[in-house]
Amino acid sequence: MSQVEKVSILGSDSIHVGYGIQDHIVEETLTNLKSSTYVIITDSNMEATAPYQTLSSKFEAGLKEFRPESRLFYYAVSPGENNKSRETKAQVEDFLLQKGCTRDTVIIAVGGGVVGDMIGFVAATFMRGVRVVQVPTTLLAMVDSSIGGKTAVDTPLGKNFVGAFHQPKYVFVDVSFLTTLPTRQFINGMAEVVKTAAIWNEEEFTRLENFAKTFIAVVTSDNIDLATIKDDLVKTVLESIRVKADVVSADEKESSLRNLLNFGHTIGHAIEAIVTPQALHGECVAVGMVKEAELARYWGVLSPVAVARLVNCIAAYNLPTSVGDKIFVQRIGHKRHFIQINTLLEKMAIDKKNDGSKIRTVILEAIGKCYQLKAHEVSKQDLSFVLTDETLVHPFQEETTPKENVVIPPGSKSISNRALILAALGKGTVRIKNLLHSDDTKHMLAAVAALKGAEISTEDNGDTIVVKGNGGNFITCDEQLYLGNAGTASRFLTTVASLVNVNEQSNDYTVLTGNARMQERPVGPLVNALRANGSEIEYLNNEGSLPLKIKAGKGLKGGRVELAATISSQYVSSILMCAPYAEKEVTLALVGGKPISQLYIDMTIAMMKDFGISVTRDPHEEHTYHIPKGVYSNPGVYEVESDASSATYPLAFAAMTGTSCTVPNIGSSSLQGDARFAVDVLKPMGCTVEQTSTSTTVRGPSKGSLKPLTHVDMEPMTDAFLTASVVAAIANSSVPTQITGIANQRVKECNRILAMVDELAKFGVRAEELPDGIEIYGIDYKNLKVPSLENRGVCTYDDHRVAMSFSLLAGMCPEPVLITERSCTGKTWPGWWDVLHTKFGVELEGYEEPKDLNDPALLVNKEVNGDKSIVVIGMRAAGKSTLSRWIADFMGFELIDLDTVFEQTHGDIREYIKANGWGRFRELEAGIMKEYLTKCSSRHVISTGGGIVESEESRDILKSYTKTGGIVLHLHRDLDETIVFLSSDTTRPAYVSEIKDVWARREKWYHECSNYHFYSSHCGTEEEFKKLRHSFVSYLKTITGAGLSPVPKGRSFVLSLACSDLNDIAENLEDIVAGCEAIELRVDLLKDYSPSFVADQTAVLRKFVNLPIIYTIRTKGQGGNFPDEDVQALEQLSYLGIKLGVDYLDVQLSNSEKFVKSIIEKKAFTKIIATHIDLAGLPWTRAEWDNKYNQGISLNADVIQLVGFAHAFQDNIDLEQFRANHTITPLIAFNAGEHGKLSRVLNRTLTPVTSELLSNVSGNGQLTVGEINRCFSEIGGLSRRNFYIVGNPISHSRSPQLHTAGYEKLNLPHRFSKFETDYAQKVYEEVMTKPGFGGLAVTIPLKLDIMKYVSELSESAKIIGAVNTVTPLDGQPGKFYGDNTDWYGITQSFVRHGVPSFGNSSVNGMVVGGGGTSRAAAFALHQMGCKKIYMVNRTTSKLHEIKSSLPSDFNIEVLETVDQVEAADPVSLVVSCVPADKPLDSELLNKVERILYHGKNQEKRSFVPTLLDAAYKPRVTPIMKIAEEKFGWAVVPGVEMLVNQGVLQFKVHTVFTPPYKNVYEAVVDDNV
């Protein structure tokens, strides 16, 4: 039998730990726990595993041997947290009662935390308490939930809210059970292990730090073999259990000490409550531990080093350290947006360990030790600060600011990075003290370790870093070295990577990469110098920046190396430090002028001497150094000096506030240039400065009396210029402060000089850029402006020095100032905000930008395209020129045709190819594309030649662009039409081969080079051309993220098309989809699966129907037609749907996890419907349905669709119970078959329906919209409601006809009547307060009067200032909602008449008239995107009233004179709101005609200018006649506005969209 370790808890050795101890479990239980009945309870997942089955067999055998008279029962609950409920507990208890179990029963709970908690609670209450044995099978359960006797079930209001303390008789921890654990669950459990060590045992924490790499390597391998780490794993579990057992023994009922076990849980549980089940408990606690450790640091209790150790240890186990962690965000998807400060605080307020509503957390004092051994009350303000990356810096208060202060900054970043490189290159062991623990050094340490350059460990609770150097013997590794935005590390490691040798088991190269900003920062001069010295270095993205691919085994040749050092001294230091390892001695000559930051070069040389290599300056050649060959000899101890750049911030604080501050460990003897800041900058500005060789003290003048510096050369301390700039900002004088010598600051984390100019302007301080510096015009601090929250306060550009500098100026303002991205200070001073708060007494407050959580843009994980340029590819005649122009119009981009660019440089393409051949042409073509993608990377549409994909170089460029998130759009049209067109085109080169052969060759290239695809259907008429443009712009909105529609919230239907070719029904599509919110394309039922045909089918849908497309490929195993075995084709066809920009992609959960994840990773802005179909009729009470639902949630699906099969009516009832319990994600759930029709009726979201106009039905038991509504109404789900048109006169109103037509078509039971009156009060008393009231259509004279009877207003109603639609507010009896749909009537009328969405292009509109409708017209034109809205009327006083009452961003101009009309920009859209029954005033007509004339004749217009007349009688009004016949404008009759506003009104009333054709005909019938 394997060794068993016993742990005592509450005086009993009842916790037994070992590996493979199942025989011991059986023998111990049956020997010592005598019973007539043993019940083993697990879940259905564990039930199927080999270890469980072995344990069951051994129990059965043991029972025969030890207790032959006893009974043994088994029970399996459904798995998952959602089944840890009172209902499941009752089911278990019913089973025990049915089996005749009595008080002597022994229950053995085998499973994870869910089983242990719930079955423990069963044991606590069954027969008033029976014995229980815990056999935990997950790491989390082994070290946490099974220990200590806590039992519980969840309730709808929270986790573990109903439970009891009930100690198990035994806890048997058999670590071999972990072989059944998925990798993620394994890692999840390590959070609790790290926690127990962090609060109790520093020695064990150190062991865990060292064990992490081995552990992760084993548990993430394809074939997990725990035997290789068995001893370490048992010790890991055992030590964690011992901690918890000690704590529980001292405090069983969690009255004091046991609260320590909740370290990380206050915040972690709050996060978990929001993101479960996508994120696991341990993952959330890991984030919680980091945040609670940061809170302890914020209080000044925990050292920054300890926080860094904790963060690094958690990260080493692949656990998240923030809610912004890349993997964490991928897992929780759009729920990231729900993690908001107020929500978290609300969750924390109901934590069980709180004192009433006072939030308490566990505070670490050191690794292995808790502060005062209790949980502490925490203010919401302090919590809000640590929970967000944005902070409000409150004004510095004289009463809370210490008059004198001593601050010790962290270790120098410059010295720390150099010390690590030298130590890794050196031989022997060095103990580095006061090393900066920051993002930069973390990346450096990780890189050195990855390259096997040194063995790295810690001492003194992490304060000392021990580096055992390998003498420069680095070898390649598998992974890329990610350096974040660590510029110093990237430049030093570029040369180090040139020294790396080849690891035969890995790559023959090293890749250095970083974040987006790092991939813009220059490294070119260094690379050029290294290339010239024998290194092979390749740029993988942008020329001159990371990522770099550096060939291993090349080394440095040595000899003379010339380097341009006018941009960065770090290039020089990089080569200096590595030069001793070159083949020959190095002579380093710095060319191109005086080197920048000479003091940092001197620092490097001095440090090299400390490590045993002496550099000599050439006595004759300026800026030239001789470096001997050799190996560094590591000193025993190396002390890193505090960071002089960081020291400038506390010193500047003293200068600005008139107080005193001492930095005790930086003085005149410092290696760092920034040590001169106090003497050279602050002293001349009026400060008293005392500087010894080792310390610096600054005392500021009285507040507000700083003097400007006429000129200061800060070349020796360039990083400190930002600090100097904010001090100069309040040096009030007519003389500006001029700072020079800082040109290198333009290529740091950001362009710091420009950043300082832009951000100072937000404070009302003028600053100007100089060629190598900045000039600042200081003002009185009392006159500082407060950067507005609306404009997002101070932007830090993710730059630590920008953030720290402006944190000082912010406190000088009269009101709090927002600083964004505050955590960027982690680069050099992770604890800066804590120092500001604790040492300087500054009030800080967390801030979070308000979000509309209903914004569909929050539901996607992809960033919107924004200003990023769009590349268009495709065959000639595919429509690239036209559609590229449409893209440019919509996006507001410039259009570049690369063929035109070529001809401007090289002449006619045909002639060039004749003279030079296709090969040379393709080479130049690729070069041009690369050039323009670089210099026109934003706000351009780049249209390419048809053969751009013929060149491999061009293909690589295009594919690289898609990988960086750029859009490469492939346009295509019917090939036969293309051939007809190209056969007659003599302006382009003839193809060597036939057109079809060319397409056959290029097709796969087009698909692999593009990430989006649009098929242009043939347009035979102007009307079809307009439809194409409208559908293309809708497509463009989807793929760029500019226009995303949310999942419907009310009852909604989707028309499921079972057609082999949609062209057969195209003309009837608008009628077919009546009443539906989406349309499903069943791709598997199409006659052809080729990309071109499938794309054509989506084009048909877009041409005839303006509805979201659901793209579905159903395999035969899931009731469809696509072959189950052709997985590769299924994946390609699914990805095609994403490229086609469909709104929804149906993904079958029956596919492999790898398949599903690969599709979801590419989904962009397409929503995912995670679908599972079981046509065998699996009961809805089975756990498999829970598993599928949770699987959909874990994939961050936007909608989950579960389809069963009904054998009996009861199946529908069971389904509704399931639906009621599964509300996290929108659910489509119904039963197929005749018996399942009721479930279709009861389904709320996107119910699949058919149409009476279709001959084929895609689903068994499918119904029409009308059938469902009628049935739902008959069973009481849809009550009859009464709607009215109110106002006077209304006798000729067509609203009753419009709404009634919609009711009849959709089988809605409602009634629409007229209620004629002039009095809103009468409407309220006699209509709105009556039972069955559904809503109002409001017309004159009541649109204003009715507003006092509504409780809420839509945005449109608020701005327009009138209501035309009223509905009762759901769940709020006696309260009503007011809306205005007139604006929608205008916009949709324009859209239906071919006016495209013009997005960011410059289109102007005009409103004629000054009545109530004019306000709706102005609102409509603004919604459409008009940049400027002109208004004209016979009398202008009303127009000025309208202008002043509407938002300023409507950009309204009132045209009063003819001169103003003539000076106006051309107008493309006009809405006439004047009566049509009398002629226009002549003066007004003159102005209107001039506008119409200029609109028609404007130079740049992308559509026919269009006029809409809001008057619907007569059908053709005088102004329409003038616009169309005299000036060639398109015109829209007012009846269209009436219908379109009614369509939205109908939807507001009923949640359904009425069939347009039916309601239109009802309105125009007899309406001439």
From Swiss-Prot:
GO terms for cellular component: cytoplasm. Residues 393-842 are annotated as: EPSP synthase. Keywords: Amino-acid biosynthesis, Aromatic amino acid biosynthesis, ATP-binding, Cytoplasm, Kinase, Lyase, Metal-binding, Multifunctional enzyme, NADP, Nucleotide-binding, Oxidoreductase, Transferase, Zinc. Residues 1057-1267 are annotated as: 3-dehydroquinase. Binds 2 Zn(2+) ions per subunit. Residues 1-380 are annotated as: 3-dehydroquinate synthase. NAD(+) binds at residues 43-45, 81-84, 112-114, 117, 137-138, 159, 177-180, 188. In the N-terminal section; belongs to the sugar phosphate cyclases superfamily. Dehydroquinate synthase family. The AROM polypeptide catalyzes 5 consecutive enzymatic reactions in prechorismate polyaromatic amino acid biosynthesis. This is Pentafunctional AROM polypeptide. It comes from Clavispora lusitaniae (strain ATCC 42720) (Yeast).
